[in-house]
Regions:
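Histidine-anchored nucleotide/phosphate-binding helix
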Residues: 16-32
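C-terminal structural segments of small proteins and small subunits
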Residues: 79-109
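Short, glycine-rich nucleotide/cofactor-binding loops
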Residues: 3-18, 43-50
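Charged helix-capping and loop-helix junction motifs
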Residues: 19-22, 51-57, 89-90
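A short beta-strand-loop structural module common to alpha/beta enzyme folds
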Residues: 35-43
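Hydrophobic anchor at the start of a short beta-strand
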Residues: 3, 34-35, 69
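A glycine-rich helix N-cap at a beta->alpha junction
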Residues: 52-80
Length: 110
């Protein structure tokens, strides 16, 4: 199955982000395809250098699984993330809509 995850909480703001990371690992271990992780709202902070272990987790996952890491452009702008470090990219909400067509499941974490 092909999955897209929507992460709406920051790395240190509760269990939502931790659950997303655990779910992403479980998908990889079970042979599912994680197509895209869409970071929205406070979730875009996963791409900031102030949480290097979180940033490294998603980067490693993207490289090993071939997943896209997408930051909502409006949310990223609010946090001053105008030039994210690859493999994180900026896209609008249209990328999330597109994921709805390309994925079998979209799971959100907040």
């Amino acid at each position: 199955m092909k999955y897209t995850l929507v992460v709406m909480t920051g790395p240190e703001n509760g269990m939502g982000h931790d659950r997303a990371r655990g779910f992403a690992q479980a998908l990889a271990q079970q042979g599912h395809r994680l197509q895209r992780v869409f970071f929205y709202g406070d979730g875009v902070r996963a791409a900031q250098g102030e949480t290097p272990q979180c940033q490294q987790f998603w980067t490693t996952l993207a490289e090993s699984e071939g997943s896209e890491l997408v930051l909502c452009s409006a949310s990223a702008e609010r946090y001053g993330l105008t030039e994210p470090v690859p493999p994180f990219t900026l896209m609008g909400l249209g990328a999330l809509m597109e994921a709805g067509f390309d994925s079998d499941r979209i799971i959100s974490f907040d």
